[in-house]
């Protein structure tokens, strides 16, 4: 898939707001070391996440999963743990 469109992704999620949440959560997982479900090529995590949604490999169910703690060498991990900050989804 050369280019991902919102329409491709909306076949697998209910609306564009949910698409934003699903893609953001998946991009965070990829940044934390999760294995991509599609060929990553030279794409950034956000594009890979959208390609996974468009391919039907990632769905709304990802929002129900607990996010693992960030890797120690992940940027901002020390700040997040020190402040007890929650992720953007409010979990």
UniProtKB/Swiss-Prot annotation:
Q: Does the keyword Transcription apply?
A: yes
Under Enzyme Commission nomenclature, its number is: 2.7.7.6
Region (Disordered) location: 66-91
Q: Name one GO cellular component term.
A: DNA-directed RNA polymerase complex
Which key words are in the record?
DNA-directed RNA polymerase, Nucleotidyltransferase, Transcription, Transferase
The protein's GO terms of the molecular function aspect are: DNA binding; DNA-directed RNA polymerase activity
InterPro entries on file: DNA-dir_RNA_pol_omega, Pol_omega/Rpo6/RPB6, RPB6/omega-like_sf
Report the record's Gene Ontology biological process terms: DNA-templated transcription
What does the record give as the reaction this protein catalyses? RNA(n) + a ribonucleoside 5'-triphosphate = RNA(n+1) + diphosphate
Subunit notes for this chain? The RNAP catalytic core consists of 2 alpha, 1 beta, 1 beta' and 1 omega subunit. When a sigma factor is associated with the core the holoenzyme is formed, which can initiate transcription.
- Into which family does the record put it? Belongs to the RNA polymerase subunit omega family.
Q: What's this chain's function? A: Promotes RNA polymerase assembly. Latches the N- and C-terminal regions of the beta' subunit thereby facilitating its interaction with the beta and alpha subunits.
NCBIfam families the UniProt entry points to: rpoZ (TIGR00690)
Protein name per its UniProtKB record: DNA-directed RNA polymerase subunit omega
**What is the originating organism of this protein?**
Acidithiobacillus ferrooxidans (strain ATCC 23270 / DSM 14882 / CIP 104768 / NCIMB 8455)
């Amino acid at each position: 898939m050369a280019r991902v469109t919102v329409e491709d992704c909306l076949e697998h999620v209910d609306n564009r707001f949910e698409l934003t949440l699903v893609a953001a959560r998946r991009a965070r997982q990829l940044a934390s070391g999760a294995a991509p479900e599609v060929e990553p090529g030279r794409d950034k995590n956000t594009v890979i996440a959208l390609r996974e949604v468009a391919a039907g490999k990632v769905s709304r169910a990802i929002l129900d999963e607990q996010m693992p703690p960030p890797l120690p060498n992940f940027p901002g991990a020390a700040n997040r743990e020190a402040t007890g900050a929650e992720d953007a989804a409010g979990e």
